Amino acid sequence: MAKTQMQLANRAWRTETKSLGWHHGWKTGRKGWKAFCRENATITVEEHLKTDPPFEDQADANWHVAEELTYWTP
């Protein structure tokens, strides 16, 4: 079964933020980190579909999220 755009983006946010070590230190623990990823995935999908075609696969979603995170990290 094909993944939805939201599922691809959510997994990409979890994968990419975990690789940066952002999954540690949340006051609300793992649930807080997952909620953060889910909220940002929603925004990513909305903004991405305004200007670009849908994500082709997980690697494409990961690339777009990693690219977005380069603007967040010093």
Question: What do these predicted ranges mean?
Answer:
Residues 1-74:
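C-terminal alpha-helical interaction appendages
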